[in-house]
Amino acid sequence: MKKLKNSELNRISIEEFKNSSKTPIKVLLDNIRSAHNVGSIFRSCDAFLIDEIILCGITAKPPNKEIRKTALGSTDSVKWSYFENIKDAILKLKQEKYQIISVEQADKSTDLKNFKIQSKKKYAIIFGNEINGVNQKVIDMSDDVVEIPQFGTKHSFNVSVCVGIVVWDFFTKIKTN
Protein backbone atom coordinates (compact mmCIF):
# COMPACT_ATOMS: atom_id res chain seq x y z
CA MET A 1 0.00 0.00 0.00
CA LYS A 2 1.32 3.46 -0.84
CA LYS A 3 0.10 6.92 -0.05
CA LEU A 4 -1.36 8.68 -3.09
CA LYS A 5 -0.06 12.00 -4.35
CA ASN A 6 -2.52 14.83 -4.91
CA SER A 7 -2.10 14.34 -8.66
CA GLU A 8 -3.30 10.72 -8.28
CA LEU A 9 -6.55 11.54 -6.47
CA ASN A 10 -8.62 12.17 -9.62
CA ARG A 11 -10.39 15.18 -8.12
CA ILE A 12 -12.90 17.02 -10.26
CA SER A 13 -12.28 20.61 -11.34
CA ILE A 14 -14.16 23.56 -9.88
CA GLU A 15 -16.17 23.79 -13.12
CA GLU A 16 -17.03 20.07 -12.95
CA PHE A 17 -18.00 20.52 -9.29
CA LYS A 18 -20.34 23.40 -10.14
CA ASN A 19 -21.99 21.34 -12.90
CA SER A 20 -22.23 18.09 -10.92
CA SER A 21 -25.27 16.66 -9.21
CA LYS A 22 -25.27 17.84 -5.59
CA THR A 23 -26.22 16.20 -2.33
CA PRO A 24 -29.67 17.61 -1.42
CA ILE A 25 -28.41 19.35 1.71
CA LYS A 26 -28.09 23.00 2.58
CA VAL A 27 -25.87 23.79 5.57
CA LEU A 28 -26.92 26.83 7.61
CA LEU A 29 -24.34 28.50 9.85
CA ASP A 30 -25.89 30.82 12.42
CA ASN A 31 -23.65 33.41 14.07
CA ILE A 32 -20.43 31.40 13.79
CA ARG A 33 -17.70 33.50 15.43
CA SER A 34 -14.60 31.93 13.91
CA ALA A 35 -13.78 32.52 10.25
CA HIS A 36 -11.37 29.56 10.50
CA ASN A 37 -14.33 27.33 11.40
CA VAL A 38 -16.26 28.72 8.43
CA GLY A 39 -13.37 27.88 6.09
CA SER A 40 -13.12 24.34 7.45
CA ILE A 41 -16.86 23.92 6.94
CA PHE A 42 -16.53 25.01 3.30
CA ARG A 43 -13.93 22.24 2.82
CA SER A 44 -16.18 19.58 4.36
CA CYS A 45 -19.11 20.72 2.24
CA ASP A 46 -16.94 20.56 -0.88
CA ALA A 47 -15.88 17.01 0.02
CA PHE A 48 -19.50 15.80 0.15
CA LEU A 49 -20.90 17.83 -2.80
CA ILE A 50 -23.22 19.82 -0.54
CA ASP A 51 -25.69 21.94 -2.49
CA GLU A 52 -25.17 25.22 -0.60
CA ILE A 53 -23.92 26.87 2.56
CA ILE A 54 -26.14 29.62 3.97
CA LEU A 55 -24.26 32.04 6.19
CA CYS A 56 -26.35 33.94 8.73
CA GLY A 57 -25.91 36.74 11.24
CA ILE A 58 -22.31 37.53 12.25
CA THR A 59 -20.89 34.54 10.36
CA ALA A 60 -17.93 35.65 8.22
CA LYS A 61 -18.45 35.70 4.46
CA PRO A 62 -16.00 35.20 1.59
CA PRO A 63 -13.82 36.82 0.48
CA ASN A 64 -12.07 36.74 3.84
CA LYS A 65 -8.40 35.93 4.43
CA GLU A 66 -9.16 33.94 7.61
CA ILE A 67 -11.73 31.80 5.76
CA ARG A 68 -9.29 31.36 2.87
CA LYS A 69 -6.63 29.89 5.21
CA THR A 70 -8.73 26.84 6.04
CA ALA A 71 -11.06 26.67 3.02
CA LEU A 72 -8.16 26.00 0.61
CA GLY A 73 -10.14 27.24 -2.39
CA SER A 74 -13.46 25.57 -1.57
CA THR A 75 -15.20 28.97 -1.41
CA ASP A 76 -14.78 28.95 -5.20
CA SER A 77 -16.56 25.61 -5.61
CA VAL A 78 -19.31 25.55 -2.97
CA LYS A 79 -22.30 27.78 -3.60
CA TRP A 80 -23.06 30.09 -0.69
CA SER A 81 -25.50 32.84 0.22
CA TYR A 82 -26.04 35.19 3.15
CA PHE A 83 -29.06 36.09 5.27
CA GLU A 84 -28.82 38.65 8.04
CA ASN A 85 -31.50 36.76 9.96
CA ILE A 86 -31.62 32.95 9.97
CA LYS A 87 -35.40 33.01 10.44
CA ASP A 88 -35.76 34.50 6.94
CA ALA A 89 -33.57 31.72 5.53
CA ILE A 90 -35.63 29.06 7.31
CA LEU A 91 -38.93 30.47 6.02
CA LYS A 92 -37.58 30.49 2.45
CA LEU A 93 -36.34 26.90 2.79
CA LYS A 94 -39.68 25.75 4.22
CA GLN A 95 -41.39 27.23 1.14
CA GLU A 96 -38.95 25.19 -0.96
CA LYS A 97 -40.01 22.03 0.95
CA TYR A 98 -36.78 21.48 2.86
CA GLN A 99 -36.81 19.49 6.10
CA ILE A 100 -35.32 21.82 8.71
CA ILE A 101 -32.96 19.97 11.05
CA SER A 102 -31.15 21.65 13.94
CA VAL A 103 -28.06 20.03 15.43
CA GLU A 104 -28.25 20.58 19.17
CA GLN A 105 -28.53 18.92 22.55
CA ALA A 106 -32.25 19.00 23.33
CA ASP A 107 -34.66 17.04 25.51
CA LYS A 108 -36.35 15.34 22.54
CA SER A 109 -33.45 15.22 20.10
CA THR A 110 -32.85 12.22 17.84
CA ASP A 111 -29.51 10.46 18.13
CA LEU A 112 -27.72 11.05 14.82
CA LYS A 113 -27.21 7.32 14.19
CA ASN A 114 -30.98 6.77 14.58
CA PHE A 115 -32.05 9.62 12.28
CA LYS A 116 -33.77 8.15 9.22
CA ILE A 117 -33.26 9.79 5.85
CA GLN A 118 -36.37 9.85 3.69
CA SER A 119 -35.77 9.35 -0.02
CA LYS A 120 -36.42 12.34 -2.26
CA LYS A 121 -36.39 14.74 0.72
CA LYS A 122 -34.19 17.81 0.83
CA TYR A 123 -32.51 18.74 4.10
CA ALA A 124 -31.44 22.07 5.60
CA ILE A 125 -29.15 21.42 8.56
CA ILE A 126 -28.58 24.21 11.08
CA PHE A 127 -25.42 24.63 13.14
CA GLY A 128 -25.26 27.29 15.83
CA ASN A 129 -22.81 29.60 17.51
CA GLU A 130 -19.73 28.08 19.15
CA ILE A 131 -20.76 29.30 22.62
CA ASN A 132 -24.57 29.34 22.63
CA GLY A 133 -25.42 26.70 20.04
CA VAL A 134 -28.68 26.84 18.11
CA ASN A 135 -31.10 29.47 19.41
CA GLN A 136 -34.31 28.09 20.97
CA LYS A 137 -36.45 30.11 18.53
CA VAL A 138 -34.63 28.40 15.67
CA ILE A 139 -35.17 24.99 17.31
CA ASP A 140 -38.87 25.86 17.53
CA MET A 141 -38.91 26.42 13.75
CA SER A 142 -37.18 23.08 13.08
CA ASP A 143 -38.83 19.86 11.95
CA ASP A 144 -36.39 17.79 13.99
CA VAL A 145 -33.33 18.12 16.20
CA VAL A 146 -30.44 15.69 15.91
CA GLU A 147 -27.66 15.20 18.41
CA ILE A 148 -24.25 13.58 18.11
CA PRO A 149 -23.82 11.23 21.08
CA GLN A 150 -20.85 12.09 23.29
CA PHE A 151 -19.30 10.10 26.11
CA GLY A 152 -16.43 12.19 27.50
CA THR A 153 -16.26 15.06 29.95
CA LYS A 154 -16.88 17.86 27.43
CA HIS A 155 -20.35 18.73 26.29
CA SER A 156 -19.68 19.83 22.72
CA PHE A 157 -17.66 19.41 19.54
CA ASN A 158 -15.98 22.22 17.65
CA VAL A 159 -18.61 23.41 15.15
CA SER A 160 -16.46 22.52 12.13
CA VAL A 161 -15.97 18.99 13.49
CA CYS A 162 -19.71 18.76 14.17
CA VAL A 163 -20.51 19.78 10.58
CA GLY A 164 -18.07 17.18 9.24
CA ILE A 165 -19.64 14.39 11.31
CA VAL A 166 -23.26 15.29 10.53
CA VAL A 167 -22.74 16.01 6.83
CA TRP A 168 -20.81 12.74 6.37
CA ASP A 169 -23.60 10.84 8.15
CA PHE A 170 -26.37 12.42 6.05
CA PHE A 171 -24.31 11.98 2.86
CA THR A 172 -23.74 8.27 3.44
CA LYS A 173 -27.39 7.69 4.38
CA ILE A 174 -28.61 9.56 1.28
CA LYS A 175 -26.22 7.68 -1.02
CA THR A 176 -27.27 4.28 0.38
CA ASN A 177 -31.00 5.09 0.53
Show which residues each predicted segment covers.
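Post-transcriptional modification and biogenesis factors for structured RNAs
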Residues: 1-177
